Every structure is written in structure tokens, then in C-alpha cells.
Amino acid sequence: MDAKKLILVGGGGHCKSVIDVAESAGFSILGILDIPENVGKTVLSYPIIGTDDNIPEYVDKALFIVTVGHIKDPNLRIKIHERIETAGGRLATLISGTSHVSKYSSIGEGSVVMHQAVVNADAKIGKGCIINTFANIEHDAVIEDFCHISTGAMINGN
């Protein structure tokens, strides 16, 4: 498997933003998995090639990233992550080329750090997190698994 090939799971608005981050990070997007009625359509010229039922077909071909946003409730994102892991898939971690991530911080698998976000020294980001555009995670902050830090949010250090 080429470590820079990527399958996106979820074809809505958040998917569009993640496409931009994935491209800036040098990933090659093979396609998108979404709901059945969207198969055959495109998102920013990338094809919707199947549904999450097709995850097992791609575990040896690409890494995965969940591109379902759901700010209020992470349960759908958690279920998709679990489905990928159960199938033997690996989750990518995407970091925008325009963000700043301290070498002293840690970012969990399946997380996305969007454009212009800042993750400072000794901050810890869990798995499956969304650190959205212009969010600022200061020193020593801990963001648990599957949290969505919204656009422009500021999380101060200790």
C-alpha cells in the first residue's frame, strides 16, 4: 500500500475542506465513500466510488480519513472509525501545510489539523479529532478522542 493514497469516508461539506488539506499535504485521493444515493457523483471532481460497505475493498490500497463533520454529536464519526479499524484499515493523520504543529505536540491517528490552525508545545490531540480552520490549541492542552474544535476556537494552556 502506498502510504500517500487516501480514501475519504463522507461526502458532505467537511469533505470539501479535508480534500484541500489532503492535497496540501501531498496525498493522492483515490475516491470517496458516501451514502448509496450519492455513488457515481463527485465532490470537487473526486468520484464517490461506493459506501462504507466497501471499506474492506480498500484496506490494502489506501489509508482512510473520516470526512463526516457532525459538530454536535461524534457518534457517527466514531462508528465509521470503528468500522475502518475492524476491517483492518489504517487511518491517516492530515496536517495542513499552512498550519503550525509544534514538534513537541502529539496528534492521534485519524485526526485532521485544518488550514491556519495552531497546535502548540506539549498539546495532546486524541484520535479522530478535527482541529478546524484558525483554531488555536495552546501549550499543555489535552483534546480527547473524537473532539471537534470548531473554526476559530481558542483552547488556552494551563
Specify the residue positions occupied by each region the protein language model found.
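Short alpha-helical
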Residues: G13-H14, K72-N75, S106
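Short amphipathic alpha-helical segments
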Residues: I19-V21, R77-I80, I125
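Hydrophobic, well-ordered beta-alpha structural blocks that scaffold small-molecule cofactor pockets
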Residues: M1-V43, I49-D52, P56-E57
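Structural signal for interior beta-strand "rungs" in well-ordered beta-sheet cores
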Residues: L94-G157
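Phosphate-bearing ligand-interacting subdomains
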Residues: V39-H100
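Fold-independent oxyanion-binding glycine-rich loops
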Residues: G11, I35, T51, V68, ...
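Glycine-rich, phosphate-binding/catalytic loops in enzymes
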Residues: A25, H81-I84, C129-I131, C147
